[in-house]
Curated annotation (Swiss-Prot):
UniProt name for this protein: Protein DMP8
Location (main, coarse): endoplasmic reticulum
PANTHER family: PROTEIN DMP3 (PTHR31621), PROTEIN DMP8-RELATED (PTHR31621:SF11)
Ranges of Low complexity composition bias in the record: 14-29
Organism expressing this protein natively: Arabidopsis thaliana
Organism phylogeny: Eukaryota, Viridiplantae, Streptophyta, Embryophyta, Tracheophyta
Length: 243
């Protein structure tokens, strides 16, 4: 049986694969209710605030030490150590009330006075090998504790005539005043580079104080170095290493 073209037809189908969107991608994510989220305890939030404040204080201390490390050599040894030990007990958690601010003022005054007066002290080594300290005066060295005279206790005693009272090296000079004033300036530069001090003494002025203290310690170091070269000293008083 013959088939004509009208009775026989060929249809060609082209199959195209269409990617059906996944039901999960077409759907928008459901909002999560706030009530289902875990709530942090109040102590955790407060602890995070304290930890952040401690990190800021530690960062300020590191910045202070890095800026003023070159100035430490101009200060008596015990002054800066006392300041760094007493300040954390006053500052505590950053509570700058009236009492804490007053105590910071007193601490700064005490340390500044020690920087000033310690530069008017000197020492000498006696024949018994001990080191004796005293204040330099226009007349000579005024020893804090005079050694006992021979015959009272015996042993390691020196005669009072060994005290260099009339020695020119132990008389008050202009260099002593220059070094005292410069030492106070160096201490103030170090103290005000600490954010714990500026935050309590100048509340709300932290940004301005940071800008000032960016260059103030460097300027103090340059000026003090130049003046200490012009006015050298050979004092080995309280807080200095004796040779």
């Amino acid at each position: 049986m013959e088939k004509t073209e009208e009775s026989v037809g060929i249809r060609v189908y082209t199959t195209t694969t269409t990617q059906n969107p996944s039901p999960t991608s077409s759907r928008s994510p459901k909002p999560v209710p706030l009530s289902s989220l875990p709530m942090l305890p109040a102590g955790a939030a407060a602890g995070g605030g304290k930890g952040r404040k401690r990190r800021m204080v530690a960062k300020g201390v590191q910045k202070t030490v890095s800026k003023t490390s070159m100035l430490v050599n101009f200060l008596p040894t015990g002054t800066l150590l006392m300041f760094e030990m007493v300040l954390p007990t006053i500052y505590r958690d950053g509570d700058c009330n009236g009492i804490n601010t007053l105590m910071i003022h007193l601490l700064l005054l005490l340390c500044a006075m020690s920087c000033f007066f310690f530069h008017f002290t000197d020492s000498f080594k006696a024949s018994d090998g001990k080191i004796y300290y005293g204040f330099v005066t226009p007349r000579g060295l005024a020893v804090f504790m005079k050694p006992p005279s021979p015959g009272f206790g015996g042993g390691d005693v020196i005669a009072e005539k060994e005290i260099p009272v009339t020695d020119e090296r132990y008389k008050l000079r202009v260099n002593d005043f220059v070094h005292s004033v410069m030492s106070v300036l160096v201490f103030m530069a170090i103290a005000f580079s600490d954010r714990r001090v500026t935050g309590c003494l100048f509340p709300g002025k932290e940004k301005e104080m940071d800008q000032v203290m960016e260059s103030f310690p460097l300027m103090v170091g340059i000026v003090c170095s130049a003046l200490f070269l012009v006015f050298p000293t050979s004092r080995y008083g309280v807080g200095c290493m004796s040779t």
